[in-house]
Amino acid sequence: MGIFSIANQHIRFAVKLACAIVLALFIGFHFQLETPRWAVLTAAIVAAGPAFAAGGEPYSGAIRYRGMLRIIGTFIGCIAALIIIISMIRAPLLMILVCCVWAGFCTWISSLVRIENSYAWGLSGYTALIIVITIQTEPLLTPQFALERCSEIVIGIGCAILADLLFSPRSIKQEVDRELDSLLVAQYQLMQLCIKHGDSEEVDNAWGDLVRRTAALEGMRSNLNMESSRWVRANRRLKALNTLSLTLITQSCETYLIQNTRPELITDTFRELFETPVETVQDVHRQLKRMRRVIVWTGERETPVTLYSWVGAATRYLLLKRGVISNTKISATEEEILQGEPVVKVESAERHHAMVNFWRTTLSCILGTLFWLWTGWTSGNGAMVMIAVVTSLAMRLPNPRMVCIDFIYGTLAALPLGLLYFLVIIPNTQQSMLLLCLSLAVLGFFIGIEVQKRRLGSMGALASTINIIVLDNPMTFHFSQFLDSALGQIVGCMLAFIVILLVRDKSKDRTGRVLLNQFVSAAVSAMTTNVVRRKENRLPALYQQLFLLMNKFPGDLPKFRLALTMIIAHQRLRDAPIPVNEDLSVFHRQLRRTADHVISAGSDDKRRRYFGLLLDELDIYQEKLRIWEAPPQVTEPVKRLTGMLHKYQNALTDS
């Protein structure tokens, strides 16, 4: 397929994007809005953003969700702008500098919250800056300007959502159903590999792939939840299935590790059972029935705990999977599974990275302010807006440098494209609403094709072109103003790119160390006799951290193995029958405090000191377990955990 070819699967979304732009344009001019450009720009960004992220037509609900986030972010930004202006109207320079800090603060928050919700915070940062810059000449019009911006953005979002509904968006439900079946087969094949105890690299690749697929399934669940309220029951089941899938991975990998020291625990009966190849979910179902009969016949005590737990989790997975596919009423048995354990949310390990993003956004906005004041350029404010937009949106993504390059390419492409519309097309079509709508529909259609291909610069070109062509009411054609706006966009993107290059993000190694120490803390916190604490489900949070570690350090198998070993230790200690007495309870609290000190230590020396203290306390704890006659189900996991911490002490303490 050539560079400029059009695939059939791309046409529907391209028509949808063109329809959203035309609807926003028509409503903006029909109701005599002062700046219809905002409505058109919003419709284009809200519709095209999810398509660019997905690399194709987004699933149902994605555009609505992004639209709601944009509304929330706009209102937060407008309120912040009003507060800043009312408080500092007599000091314009201070007012702009505070807005720069506000943009940085919003970027800091957006780096810490879930990636799905970070868009709202990034948007609120540059919305306040846009309002403050725009009202510099007429500050008394601030409330009216904020109200107009909110109204036109809501209109643009409404047009994008309406266009999405008109062209029957894709449902993700069938993808979810297929992935649930495929995932269970892959889980069974992982357990086969672990019982064979073959090549460790093959096992690592298999469980790593399953971790990624389980994370992708959780993303599908979020999409399905946004799609329609009729999937509420399926959403509840999928939440539990996420935990069950992670449990299956953990039990399989623990089975592999156990055979490193005690291969005799896996009897020949189970080895023969797992030798049978499976291709479909029906094959897995038949094998599980055979295993349950064998477990009943041999007895729970004669079955390795990892296999017993794995078969139980796989059986519950099958039950909930059928419920997701049929979306029927939740049965009493399913309700018992769903009411299981409260899920603990993960604490962000990227606080240093978030602080780097804060300084990048704040410094780039301040640099733009100084450039504007020093040059006195009429479009310096436009450059400032682009700086805020680029840094606010780029910082929350894994590769902000490439986002900046995308914007630079887009603004460069927008100059000749905008010139064509400004000098030729719009002057000749402004007297006819039909021709004006058709001309912008053509723009939206062809850029919509490129957006789905994730063409570098396509998103930036769409937004930048709409921003510089004359879509105001009334239309005025001043070439110098057009050229200033176009050049302001390019200069703003360049300045943002320079700041991102100069303010280096060296937080990667620190984030990796914090993540590994959080795994250690989770394993230590599992040593407790508190009933409420033992019921907490930390597995999704731990695997979310493992997924982040895999993305930060692709191919670093020692780190992945260490993290997985800590997760296995956490799960085993969580279920271990620890003796209940006051002496051990007090010591559990002491262990948790020391583990927290390891995470929060500000220097390598402090971290080594607290880590050494933790190792000493674990030795004392093992002695206490011996005194209180704890069973092997407790002493062996604690001994393995202590040995792992001694072995990897340097990796867990050095920056």
Swiss-Prot record:
The chain crosses the membrane at residues 13-33, 38-58, 69-89, 93-113, 121-141, 152-172, 370-390, 407-427, 431-451, 459-479, 482-502. It is a multi-pass membrane protein. One of its GO terms (biological process) is carboxylic acid transport. This is p-hydroxybenzoic acid efflux pump subunit AaeB. InterPro entries: PHBA_efflux_AaeB/fusaric-R, PHBA_efflux_pump_AaeB. Forms an efflux pump with AaeA. Could function as a metabolic relief valve, allowing to eliminate certain compounds when they accumulate to high levels in the cell. GO terms for cellular component: plasma membrane. It is found in: Cell inner membrane. GO terms for molecular function: transmembrane transporter activity. It comes from the Bacteria. Keywords: Cell inner membrane, Cell membrane, Membrane, Transmembrane, Transmembrane helix, Transport. The keyword DNA-binding does not apply. PANTHER family: MULTIDRUG RESISTANCE PROTEIN MDTO (PTHR30509:SF9), P-HYDROXYBENZOIC ACID EFFLUX PUMP SUBUNIT-RELATED (PTHR30509). Belongs to the aromatic acid exporter ArAE (TC 2.A.85) family. The keyword Chaperone does not apply.
